Amino acid sequence: MRHLLSLLRSGKGLRYAPVVYADSAEFALRVVLRGLPSGPIDVSGDHCPVSMRPFVLGVRLAAKNVDQGALAPCPWLEIYPPNSETTPLARLALKSVGMLPMNQGALYLFEVARTMNRCLPRPTLWLRYLLAWQNARTAARRGDALRMSARDLRALNAYYIVARPVFLVGVGHDKREDLFPMDLVGALSSGEYLLALRATSPGVALIEASKRIAMSSAPAELLEAVYALGNRHRQPTLDLNKLTVPISSSPLFGLPVLDQAGLVRELSVERVERIGSHVLFMARIEHEAGLSGRQLAHMSGTYIEWLRRSQRGCEVLAPL
């Protein structure tokens, strides 16, 4: 009862958990865009969140899939569980809010009008939704600067059924450096790369000035140290010598990366767009080496519960 009262006060009903990202069936979900005149399109390798307030998804579509002006008025995104072609775990009804041309195709921007989540029994899910509404209602009082709406919190939780790998992003310009964790990143099937960084982040100015980014995969074993970097991210610059994790320089740009990181990726920024609460960096990969290994990722708690009820599982690093 005490736990329930605590939940009701804080409103934290839609939870997320850090997990170990793995090459396994539990992470091999399919994401399908439906409602287009050309028929359903598998966009599993072509989507990324680009804003949190409002919650906006970017979906890359090839020119052959969308004729100019032919985008359906009410498309929807479906997330399918491993080895299933029939019933989606979640369905997000989309509302088109824009389009950004890319080197290959275009990035279509969508807000989420409605969310259906099948990971939990309906009574349990509606209790979680009630708590999410309470969380949104008290956001200003709690000092939550992002203040996502209850609708967007529901959409975000369903979208994170597809785990988001975490990277340490290294940036620098004019003797200022920063290193911070991000999961709003996405490698597209076209070879292009997206990163969405909160507009208030000091890292935005550094990236805009240098047009360069270095990324290293965040090891699951360094969970606490990775989150500590996130807590220090508001500082104007970061003293890399005082960090508790070993840091080295990326081979191409000389930007800070995790020493002996499994994967190091270096990007050149080609375009910058401000979308809602975030700044979207559209980039190309200049250099990549290594493998991710046991990488930290974030996953929806509702999907973790679904896996457990289905006698499946993944390595969860913190209690739900």
Residue ranges and their predicted role:
Residues 1-320:
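Basic, polyanion-binding surface patches
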